[in-house]
Every structure is written in C-alpha cells, then in structure tokens.
Regions:
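Structural recognition of the beta-strand scaffold that forms the well-ordered cores
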Residues: 1-6, 38-43, 78-83, 120-123, ...
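Aromatic-lined carbohydrate-recognition surfaces of secreted/lumenal glycan-active proteins
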Residues: 78-85, 104-131, 180-192
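Extracytoplasmic, non-cytosolic globular domains
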Residues: 95-128, 138-144, 150, 169-176
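Intrinsically disordered, low-complexity regions enriched in small/polar residues
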Residues: 6, 24, 45, 50, ...
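Solvent-exposed loop/turn segments at secondary-structure junctions
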Residues: 8-11, 46-48, 85-89, 126-131, ...
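Short, acidic/polar
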Residues: 1, 21-28, 128-137
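Glycoside hydrolase catalytic-domain groove-lining segments
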Residues: 130-192
Length: 193
C-alpha cells in the first residue's frame, strides 16, 4: 500500500502539503497500480470559510487530478480516498460532529457531480490514547476505516503502544465489521529521519 496527501492540489499548487510534486505522485501511483498495489489518498482540505463556490472549485480540482490517474489504455487507478482525515490539527476537526458529517457528505456529492469514478471512500482517524474512536464516522458510502497511531521518536513507550493497539482494535475492528467496512491501521514512529 502506498499513501499520498492531496492537500494543495485544490489550490493549483505543484506540490502537496508534504512538499512532494503532484507529477511525481501521479507517476508513483501509476507504477504502483501496474504492480497491483493498494493506493490510498488523504485530502486534508484547506478552510474554505463557508464559500460554496470555493468549495466547489476545490473539489473540481481534486476531481481533475483523480481523473489523470489512468494508464495509457485509459484505465483509471482505483484509490481509497480519505476525505477530511481526523488528526486533531486540521480546521475541520473543530467542527461539530454534525457539521463534519455534513461537509464530508457534501464533498462526496461534489466529487460524484464531477464524475469521479475511481475512488472508494475511506474514513481516517488518528488515535490519541484514551480517546474514543469513530465519533465522527459519516456512515455514508464508506468502504474503508483507517486508524493511525504514531509515537514520536523522542517518546517511544512500548507499554503505551501495546495498550493503545489493543484499544484501537477493541474499538475500531468491531465497528468496521458492523458497518461492513474494511479495516486498516497505520502505525509506527512519526518523523524518523
């Protein structure tokens, strides 16, 4: 599985929020697709300040980019698209549960209006020890649930890590099963380097 951030494409930037050129992402996606790999994309959308036209334009730009993810035969690479991943840092994490779900569904509708056909929708959430998971789950055309849990290289604590993994699996796996979703987990150490 390869994962990519789409943040920046909606504003016409050449690189994503992590500094990776979108052209390089496209090439890597198509390479990975040819090898049968799983492709995961997060869209950490910038604040649109309630401007419906801007939201539509942002979504249109994402749709255009997703449409370019096709091989020489016109076969589009299928992507798990995590809209608005919950990390506790992005502006939309401050929305109420209902506002978040409404925005998530609006983005799905806008992508559908833009004829996006190569995505399955994912819900992605970052776990914080002691935090209840899945409170903002949109329950609307979601196929994949992903939970991310990373420790920092300066604070690696194995007992906390082991306990947290147990809590994630105890909370998220049955939830995914009840909702007929595939379950994935991203885990490791943040900012190695």
């Amino acid at each position: 599985a390869n994962g990519y951030e789409l943040g920046g494409i909606e504003s016409g930037k050449q690189q994503n929020a992590d500094g990776v050129p979108f052209k390089a992402i496209r090439e890597d996606v198509l390479n990975h697709f040819r090898k049968g790999g799983l492709l995961i994309m997060n869209w950490t959308m910038p604040h649109y300040n309630g401007n419906a036209e801007l939201l539509e334009e942002y979504t249109k730009q994402v749709a255009k980019y997703l449409d370019t993810l096709q091989d020489g035969y016109g076969i589009k690479a299928p992507v798990v698209l995590n809209l608005l991943p919950i990390d506790g840092k992005a502006w939309y994490c401050q929305l109420s549960k209902d506002e978040y779900i409404e925005l998530y569904k609006k983005l799905q509708d806008l992508l559908e209006d833009n004829d996006v056909t190569n995505v399955v929708y994912g819900y992605s959430e970052t776990y914080k020890p002691g935090k209840k998971l899945m409170e903002r789950y949109p329950d609307h055309q979601i196929d994949v649930i992903n939970v991310t849990y990373l420790q920092t290289r300066n604070a690696i604590r194995l007992p906390l890590y082991q306990q947290s993994i147990k809590e994630i699996i105890t909370q998220a796996l049955p939830f995914a099963q009840e909702h007929n979703n595939a379950f994935g987990m991203t885990t490791g150490i943040e900012s190695i380097g």
